[in-house]
Amino acid sequence: MPVPKRKTSPSRRGKRRSHDGLRPENVIVNKTTGEFQRSHHVSLDGFYNGRRVLSPKGKAGSS
């Protein structure tokens, strides 16, 4: 089974892990409802950039 020949230095380990961190989500205020939403995503009511792009779905459980 392969084993490392040398100990990995802290700086090399840190460079490898540099992309593992979590970044905060980009959040904006929705123009139509005033609620928070992720930027560059369609809101729950179907609006994107002030325009309706999706038609709203009916209430859950209605037949």
Swiss-Prot record:
Q: Where is the composition biased (Basic residues)?
A: 1-18
Q: Name one GO molecular function term.
A: structural constituent of ribosome
UniProt region (Disordered), positions on chain? 1-26
Under InterPro entries, the record lists: Ribosomal_bL32, Ribosomal_bL32_bact, Ribosomal_zn-bd
Cellular component terms, GO, for this chain's entry? large ribosomal subunit
What is the superkingdom listed in this entry's lineage? Bacteria
Mind listing the GO biological process terms from this record? translation
Q: What keywords is this UniProt entry annotated with?
A: Ribonucleoprotein, Ribosomal protein
Q: Which HAMAP family match?
A: Ribosomal_bL32
Similarity comment: Belongs to the bacterial ribosomal protein bL32 family.
NCBIfam families given in the database record: rpmF_bact
Q: What is this protein called?
A: Large ribosomal subunit protein bL32
Q: Which organism is it from?
A: Neorickettsia sennetsu (strain ATCC VR-367 / Miyayama) (Ehrlichia sennetsu)
Taxonomic lineage per UniProt?
A: Bacteria, Pseudomonadati, Pseudomonadota, Alphaproteobacteria, Rickettsiales
Q: What's the gene?
A: rpmF
